[in-house]
């Protein structure tokens, strides 16, 4: 049917279109593999936060796809990777939450230093 926008592929997958479902599953698997690679590269053993506009829209697909399998399947590191959490951030403004938390922490540190 020509070129589809990513949102169209996702929408078609939700309606059960087999080709769109395969595309979304493949995307989720690749996303998991890359996220797992980044854990290994960065040593992010405490976990990975999945953010961005596509995460809330694809949350169910991420949960039921090969995301975790590909995230964890890292050869001799597989058992360690199985203990690394991957968390989806679904808040619409996570940057503002982070900035507010940073400001509160900075204020508390300043107040504590002055005491």
Task: Label each residue range with its predicted role.
Residues 1-115:
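ATP-binding/phosphotransfer module of carbohydrate and carboxylate kinases, centering on a glycine-rich
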């Amino acid at each position: 049917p020509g070129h589809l926008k990513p949102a169209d592929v996702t929408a078609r997958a939700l309606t059960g279109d087999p080709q769109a479902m395969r595309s979304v599953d493949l995307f989720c698997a690749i996303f998991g593999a890359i996220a797992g690679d980044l854990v290994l590269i960065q040593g992010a053993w405490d976990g990975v936060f999945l953010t961005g506009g596509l995460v809330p829209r694809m949350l169910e697909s991420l949960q039921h796809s090969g995301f975790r399998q590909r995230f964890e399947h890292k050869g001799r590191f597989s058992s360690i990777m199985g203990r690394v959490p991957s968390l989806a951030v679904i808040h619409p403004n996570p940057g503002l939450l982070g900035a507010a938390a940073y400001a509160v922490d900075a204020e508390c540190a300043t107040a504590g230093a002055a005491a």
